[in-house]
A protein has these predicted regions:
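Axial heme c-ligation environment in periplasmic c-type cytochrome domains
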Residues: 46-54, 69-103
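Short pre-active-site segment immediately N-terminal to redox-active cysteine/selenocysteine motifs
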Residues: 31-34, 42, 57, 88
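Electrostatic cytochrome c docking/interface patches
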Residues: 13-31, 41-49, 67, 100-101
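The canonical Cys-X-X-Cys-His
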Residues: 34-41, 92, 96
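Sec-dependent signal peptide recognition
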Residues: 2-10
Length: 103
């Protein structure tokens, strides 16, 4: 029984560390790429014309980035910005999804 709890604790610790690392990379890329200047700190936009991304589904965020990257979804600013996120879509999406948002 003791071994079970030790294994459970170790597994939980590793999972939390990996999640924190992914969120940390996602947050760093979100800021470095300039996403924060429009979509706001933690994905909470203060401009009613720019969507907040905090708390959105990971797969939805990734799909939107891919649509902007391919040009399937049109927005001059996002069509220029989204390609810079290539390779970091999942970490950015996981970071944004982990942020809580209240209207």
């Amino acid at each position: 029984m003791k071994l079970f709890f030790q294994t459970l604790l170790l597994t939980t610790s590793i999972t939390l560390a990996l999640t924190a690392n992914a969120n940390s990379e996602g947050e760093a890329m979100y800021s470095a790429l300039g996403c924060v200047s429009c979509h706001g700190q933690g994905g909470k936009s203060t401009d009613e014309n720019i969507p907040s991304l905090a708390g959105k589904d990971v797969e939805w965020i990734i799909l939107q980035l891919e649509y902007f990257q391919s040009g399937e979804r049109k927005n001059s600013l996002m069509n220029a910005m989204a390609p810079m996120a290539e390779g970091f879509e999942r970490s950015i999406a996981e970071y944004l999804s982990s942020q809580s948002y209240k209207n």
